[in-house]
């Protein structure tokens, strides 16, 4: 019987592990990956974080390098591995959770390896779990090369011809800019694009967000509600420049598909050769067989990561408490709070 089991060894789960190591708890982190940092390693080759190194560290250990510079995905992978080794955080890899049950005052976790029992359970699988691909993708011809942004590594995966990137978030923006240098590239967005600079006066924009209190705005505050309503901006002006130079052709929201053709909200159409769905992720928790975890719309019920189900906690959710909860730097604050709640502090 463990005191605590954490499911997920990404930055959120590792942050929980950091604070659990400072307590007397017997705990372990389970993850289906083959190595620490695998979810970062599997992202596209050119991925660079839009948060500076100063805001890309977990508690207790800074990310090395120029603090206002922007780390690559490989830096983050190496950092996470070094972090786990330094703090001797117990992780069992290649362990996929099949189901979770609540039996009286403990949780029963069934995996592909064995069963585990624990008094406390922390779900740290995060929001980037299962690719969210629109159902209209099934209406396209098999001749169309389709990838989700989580599957995209580089342009070598694409077939000859044009590419449509669907989704105007930061991943979609970076991928579209990269591909526009070698082929005809379209970008379909549901909303008007808003751009923020990466740097202001030789400092990362997140330094300014920090000083202005934006990173510390709770999800229930006036500032927090405003930011959530507006959504995240595109950081950097590379996309804006590429659109202005007509290197990327901006399209309206995708509403339908038929064989080789995509139909947009303004009724225009486009014959495509490749599509990259930069349409985000969903986090299905069908393996948690416990009443009271989700509301009627399938959303996680929690207050700052604490579930109404006794002993159950969540970490790594967008806006779990503050704007900064989604950042490497911010997840540590949520982890510290959860472990304190767990210990009755």
UniProtKB/Swiss-Prot annotation:
Q: Which GO terms describe its cellular component?
A: plasma membrane
Q: How does the UniProt record describe the way this protein sits in the membrane?
A: Peripheral membrane protein
Q: Does the keyword Iron-sulfur apply?
A: no
* EC category name: oxidoreductase
One matching Pfam family:
Pyr_redox_3
PANTHER family given in the database record: FLAVIN-BINDING MONOOXYGENASE-LIKE PROTEIN (AFU_ORTHOLOGUE AFUA_4G09220), FLAVIN-CONTAINING MONOOXYGENASE
Purpose: Involved in potassium and divalent cation transport. Enhances the transport activity of the cation/potassium transporter CzcD.
Protein name, per record? Uncharacterized oxidoreductase CzcO
